[in-house]
Design a protein with these regions (language model features):
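Active-site-adjacent structural elements that line small-molecule/cofactor binding pockets in enzymes
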Residues: 1-206
Length: 206
């Protein structure tokens, strides 16, 4: 999956078709992780207003969900209007590709998570203190009418090493506590060797 894609910088219909195509090619293995970003210059380079990036992301996700799930799609908003689009292919996953919303616990991002999110990608202080972050997220999305138990959460899993070797047992020690706190998925960063044979041997225990 993407972690994260600034979806508002892409044309919604093109993004929807591209992601759906990837989902078909991968046999339904795509997750779309999105966020609003922080760099004003990126939006200016695309001719977009940085101050409205939240709404631009929301409307992009609205279009994606419609094109993934319906056959004859019409849409109208202040940002974009179209009628009678038949977008193919449809994603393998139904009703569409799972959307993971990145961000801190604030009203705008939590409303977006409650509305669109299959999962949450914590950011900033909520990623640093994941246990408090998950608790705050669940309270926030519940206030927006979403069952927080239906939202997956990704957390960073630090890798323990002894020299050049991964200590898998030590690495996994924190997993039960994180799972109990509501973390459902884990990401980690490994310096993977470039040669296939070496990479296969390196990752075998993982």
């Amino acid at each position: 999956g993407t972690n994260i894609l600034l979806a508002a910088l892409r044309r919604p219909a093109v993004l929807a078709k591209s992601v759906a195509t990837l989902d078909v090619l991968s046999g339904g293995r795509v997750d779309l992780g999105v966020g609003v970003g922080w760099q004003k210059e990126e939006y200016e380079a695309c001719g977009l207003d940085f101050t409205t990036r939240g709404r631009q992301l929301d409307h992009t996700l609205e279009v994606c969900e419609l094109l993934w799930s319906a056959q004859d799609v019409s849409y109208a908003s202040a940002e974009l209007s179209f009628s009678s689009i038949h977008a193919m292919p449809k994603p393998v996953q139904t009703p569409g590709v799972p959307i993971w919303v990145g961000g801190t616990v604030n009203n705008r991002s939590m409303e977006r998570l409650a509305r669109f999110g299959s999962g949450w990608i914590p950011w900033g202080p909520d990623a640093s203190d994941i246990f408090s972050g998950v608790k705050a997220m669940r309270e926030a999305v519940t206030a927006f009418g979403r069952d927080s138990a239906t939202i997956a959460v990704v957390g960073a899993l630090p890798v323990s090493r002894h020299g050049d070797q991964i200590d898998l047992d030590a690495t996994m020690e924190s997993v039960p506590k994180m799972v109990d706190a509501g973390i459902t998925d884990f990401r980690t960063y490994l310096p993977i060797p470039k040669k296939v044979e070496e990479a296969t041997e390196y990752l075998a225990d993982v």
